[in-house]
């Protein structure tokens, strides 16, 4: 008989017995399957209490349902690519792979000590070539179907380090490492056409109602941001257009000479207010800004260098900084556009509050009925024209009226209610070739290019003769090279001549590999499917096994992933269904967002003290206390 209870000895004994007996090993094909999954961790080096709380919830569900006769799949793996490993390589001179795998080993030991009921036979790490081979395979399928494509995109660029920075590496407009002011630079990048799935992603949120937190569904709906409205064509009339040809790019010259116009397309959800548009604003990045500023200067109405300085200032600000900026700032471009509704000439500006990523990157400004436009108009003394009369009294000197009402000052549309006017004005503009009904989305295609080493290589090469050529499937995986230099400057993959210089799979001539790697969200967008069949070396996963285990019955993770990981995973599921590889429309049946552990409690020791426990106490007691704490706060 045991003289003294020693939780560590007892835990080790039973954990060993569980492992030897394969107690938590999932059984293929048995009835009553149940798939429990917590979002897998980045191997940062240490398990913290955020992990423990998350995994305790999953463990409790898995154990309970196992005792109720369910055939449980409860796997664990590692979201192992990422920037911290590369930073460690630069700072400490340790290779990202060595740093990552050492962290995985340590964290796996910690998880085993905690006694979670994982089927470790299904363990995956996204940095293993056996895993990222299938990232590359999926990418090639997307390329075949036109879902993956390449175009130039603006990125955060550090001129000193000659490298691209993630948003989190930009601190107050400067490089986090060297302090150099960042600039927005256009670089060729790979995109995934998630917008092609926008309507399905939006529509299928209805299937998740009552199963996912309402807050997550609302965030995804807002992120997709479907807006019904109209595309309206304002235009700048140019007399003697031949005098301005050197201001204009080639693609606009024919229209300019033929029609003596430069068109500015704007998207609006309020076509009923078009008669109240008193100015037009273009995003600083809009390609027409330098064109119109050049023309404006020639006309003597604007100073091109002032416009250029404003645009450069905006380039040094992130989208987030511009969105949060309360002060409206802009510059007149020196030209006037014709409002197609009433023929009025209205000034064209560029301003900080208009983003090129949304709509067309240009807006018609109706300061009487849009608060941002009202603030801008007040600052720059621009006219405010009321065209929607509210039911009650409204002081337009104090702010814009953004609601619906009855149209006034709108020519033949006076007296119509806003909703009727939206439809009739859109039809009227369409008949005149100056507008059309349009659906716009806030959602933008996903830029997956990262100018970094520790990620999945993008499987294409560039040949002088053949152009861009996909790497054949039988040559996958394209592996990361080991002979790279980590200096913090430039793209590390470009330092490996062995990697960069290759032969064209099509003609056998000289070629250069793509040196961008994939966004790590690509890795986590389908890992839940790989857990169903993690050892498969012939395909990403067996359709039969995925049909048995999927969808994930309970998925557990933080709400901070609501509009990135969770949206991307849904997108991948739908794309893979289009390929005939999966059956289900949605990957996760029920979602639990467990809430964030406050930073001061992330330390294991601090939380143990708070719970009245020590490192010598039972692991099961810790789990019990965490569950009780969660129940009290639910």
Curated annotation (Swiss-Prot):
The keyword Iron does not apply. Its EC number is 6.1.1.4. CDD domains: LeuRS_core. Its main location: cytoplasm. Transmembrane segments: none annotated. It is an enzyme of class 6 (ligase). InterPro entries: aa-tRNA-synth_I_CS, aa-tRNA-synth_Ia, Leu-tRNA-ligase, Leu_tRNA-synth_edit, Methionyl/Leucyl_tRNA_Synth, Rossmann-like_a/b/a_fold, Val/Leu/Ile-tRNA-synth_edit. One of its GO terms (biological process) is leucyl-tRNA aminoacylation. A motif ('HIGH' region) lies at residues 43-51. GO terms for molecular function: aminoacyl-tRNA deacylase activity; ATP binding; leucine-tRNA ligase activity. One of its GO terms (cellular component) is cytosol. It is found in: Cytoplasm. It catalyses: tRNA(Leu) + L-leucine + ATP = L-leucyl-tRNA(Leu) + AMP + diphosphate. Keywords: Aminoacyl-tRNA synthetase, ATP-binding, Cytoplasm, Ligase, Nucleotide-binding, Protein biosynthesis. Belongs to the class-I aminoacyl-tRNA synthetase family. Seems to consist of an alpha chain and a beta chain. PANTHER family: LEUCINE--TRNA LIGASE, MITOCHONDRIAL, LEUCYL-TRNA SYNTHETASE. This is Leucine--tRNA ligase subunit alpha. It comes from Aquifex aeolicus (strain VF5).
